[in-house]
């Protein structure tokens, strides 16, 4: 079964969203979450990757993440 991926480009520093990311992993312990700070990038500060083999689980985790972050913190979701 392939690993599915969602990418979230965030306009906040990693340290500013660390509590939300930790809470997300507590709620979705099977989620593979990557956090990649982007220095010098003007449109976003952190690229988050969410990975799972279960499409429903991945979508629920993505929805939970988006619900935890202020809407103006999200640059885009792919």
Which stretches of residues belong to each language-model region?
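Non-catalytic beta/alpha edge segments that cap or flank active sites
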Residues: 1-78
């Amino acid at each position: 079964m392939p690993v599915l991926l969602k990418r979230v480009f965030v306009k906040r520093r990693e340290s500013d969203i660390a509590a939300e990311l930790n809470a997300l992993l507590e709620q979705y312990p099977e989620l593979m979450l990557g956090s990649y700070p982007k220095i010098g990038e003007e449109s976003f500060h952190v690229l988050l990757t969410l990975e799972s083999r279960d499409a429903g689980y991945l979508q629920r985790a993505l929805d939970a993440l988006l619900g935890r972050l202020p809407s103006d913190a999200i640059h885009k979701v792919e």
